[in-house]
Amino acid sequence: MGSRFSNKTIAIVDDDPDILQSIELAFRQEGATTKVAADGLGALHLVREGAPDLLVLDMMLPRSSGLLVLEKLQEERIELPVIMVTANQGKRHREFALGLGARAYLFKPVSLVRLLDTAESLLKGAAS
């Protein structure tokens, strides 16, 4: 069991249960506390109820897309590092997500090693 995310709460949102489970397991094995949701409204609830240290957010979600979640967080002035994860290779979507506050944009299928390394880097940047 790793510990690079001990004392960190990671919110993970994806509508694919297999992806959600694998990402959650990867963060837990590195010591994180995790909260999960399968849609955009669930993502907003997770963030509002307990301010996670980091949000891993799928773009294409039922009941409010990942982009709409980012817009809502921006409207509510809720700031936290967000990693957008998507199968959408469109450059405009990437630029839009980054413009709405996503700090990283990773394409599916995402390497769990790359995801964890990106999360670690963002959290270190947020702490300094």
Model-derived features: where do they sit?
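Acidic catalytic/metal-coordinating carboxylates
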Residues: 39-42, 65-68
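A Lys-centered signature of the CheY-like receiver
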Residues: 108
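Alpha4 helix (beta4-alpha4-beta5 surface) of REC/receiver domains from two-component response regulators
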Residues: 68, 89-104, 117
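Two-component/phosphorelay signaling modules centered on CheY-like receiver
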Residues: 17-35
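Active-site beta3 strand of CheY-like receiver
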Residues: 50-56, 61
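Non-catalytic signal-transmission and effector/linker regions of two-component phosphorelay proteins
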Residues: 1-11, 113-128
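The feature encodes the CheY-like receiver
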Residues: 20, 62, 90
